[in-house]
């Protein structure tokens, strides 16, 4: 189990945390195998497979998000060294709920990295970059800091917009092999 806090929250005082199964293989077990054990024991593997495939990309997407957050400290994002990344969720300055997949602070504390993670066949990076910039205007912790944007995606559609770093599975795996 792991306790996940939104970026910038104090470990000792926050009540805004979620508890998750840390190991992706155990998450797979409790999401797909355990609920279908009786069907699998009856040999109905094909039926279980069909049912599981409807949500499997969502499961892989959550693991991909974890990998993206782990990779931020090792990837060359705007030649800045980053602290470990976190998710962030909560009300923006406009009191509307916001969620970001990747938020990291630079080692010197002057820069903030904002990122989106998608596990889809075609991701339009320009649209995601635009959404990130829009969300950045409502984040309570970005005042006085230099913002950087990044997208982690399974497959990229279109070109890479200026001012946005883009990473795929090969980039993430290479960075995590260190």
Model-derived features with residue positions:
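A cross-kingdom feature that marks ATP-driven nucleic-acid transaction machinery
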Residues: 5-178
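Short hydrophobic beta-strand motif reused across regulatory alpha/beta modules
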Residues: 1-2
């Amino acid at each position: 189990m792991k306790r996940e806090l939104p970026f910038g929250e104090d470990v000792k005082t926050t009540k805004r945390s979620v508890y998750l199964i840390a190991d992706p293989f155990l998450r797979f077990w409790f999401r797909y195998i355990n609920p279908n054990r009786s069907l699998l024991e009856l040999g109905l593997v094909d039926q279980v497979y069909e049912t599981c495939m409807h949500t499997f990309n969502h499961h892989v997407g959550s693991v991909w998000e974890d990998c993206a957050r782990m990779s931020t400290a090792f990837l060359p994002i705007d030649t800045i060294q980053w602290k470990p990344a976190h998710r962030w969720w909560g009300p923006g300055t406009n009191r509307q709920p916001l969620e970001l997949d990747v938020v990291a602070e630079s080692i010197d504390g002057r820069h903030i990295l904002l990122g989106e993670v998608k596990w889809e066949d075609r991701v339009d990076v320009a649209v995601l970059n635009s959404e990130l910039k829009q969300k950045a205007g409502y984040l309570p912790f970005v005042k006085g800091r230099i913002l950087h944007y990044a997208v982690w995606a399974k497959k990229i559609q279109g070109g890479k917009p200026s001012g946005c770093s883009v990473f795929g599975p090969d980039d993430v795996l290479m960075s995590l092999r260190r």
